[in-house]
Amino acid sequence: MILLIDNYDSFTWNLYQYFCELGAEVLVRRNDELTLADIISLAPAKIVISPGPCTPDESGISLAAIRHFSGQTPILGVCLGHQAIAQVFGAAIVRAAKVMHGKTSPVSHTGQGVFLGLNNPLTVTRYHSLLIDPRTLPECFEVTARSEEGEIMGIRHRVFDLEGVQFHPESILSEQGHQLLANFLNR
């Protein structure tokens, strides 16, 4: 079972739908309606941290879940979830030079992890005003995708099964979103 932590974002249900279409059993819980003990009892096979309208500091149980389950359970962070992963490991989250809300842009990627077998560059949909400050991303992460402007669009932990994407693979305008999520499911 995938635990999908909902950070009060409507895109959470698009993620839910995509994962269900891929054959996954998905349990959705809001970030303030479960504790770390609840998650431990649920024993999810994978965890997805959803997008959200806030900063990682306001993402409820998300930060604690990332801290606790990193290295034990595969975790994918989407948008806010991506930022939360980076912040847990010490990166700073900063305002983007250009706000991207509902805009598509190409990202170039390494072809690893969730990007395995995807078009390169890949057209994705972005909804964010915050980004990972690249100067603060710890060495334990590799950057797996960047925008044309060089902004971090994907990260992957070098040891743990822990990955994040700044964009929304679950948006209808994102290219190969199902395949990206299938890559997370099928490893």
UniProtKB/Swiss-Prot annotation:
Q: Could you describe the subunit structure of this protein?
A: Monomer. Heterodimer consisting of two non-identical subunits: a glutamine amidotransferase subunit (PabA) and a aminodeoxychorismate synthase subunit (PabB).
**Protein's pathway:** Cofactor biosynthesis; tetrahydrofolate biosynthesis; 4-aminobenzoate from chorismate: step 1/2
Disulfide bonding pattern of the chain: none
* Residues that span the membrane, as ranges: none
Q: What is this protein called?
A: Aminodeoxychorismate synthase component 2
What lineage is on file? Bacteria, Pseudomonadati, Pseudomonadota, Gammaproteobacteria, Enterobacterales
For biological process, the GO terms are: folic acid biosynthetic process; L-tryptophan biosynthetic process; tetrahydrofolate biosynthetic process
Which keywords annotate this record? Folate biosynthesis, Glutamine amidotransferase, Transferase
**Reaction(s) catalysed (UniProt annotation):** chorismate + L-glutamine = 4-amino-4-deoxychorismate + L-glutamate
Q: What class of enzyme is it?
A: transferase
Gene name of the record: pabA
Is the Transferase keyword given for this protein?
yes
The scientific name of the source species is Klebsiella aerogenes (Enterobacter aerogenes)
Q: Which residues form the Glutamine amidotransferase type-1 domain?
A: 1-187
Q: What is its EC number?
A: 2.6.1.85
Which molecular function GO terms apply here? 4-amino-4-deoxychorismate synthase activity; anthranilate synthase activity
Question: Which residues act catalytically here?
Answer: C79, H168, E170
What does the UniProt function comment say about this protein? Answer: Part of a heterodimeric complex that catalyzes the two-step biosynthesis of 4-amino-4-deoxychorismate (ADC), a precursor of p-aminobenzoate (PABA) and tetrahydrofolate. In the first step, a glutamine amidotransferase (PabA) generates ammonia as a substrate that, along with chorismate, is used in the second step, catalyzed by aminodeoxychorismate synthase (PabB) to produce ADC. PabA converts glutamine into glutamate only in the presence of stoichiometric amounts of PabB.
One of the record's GO cellular component terms: cytosol
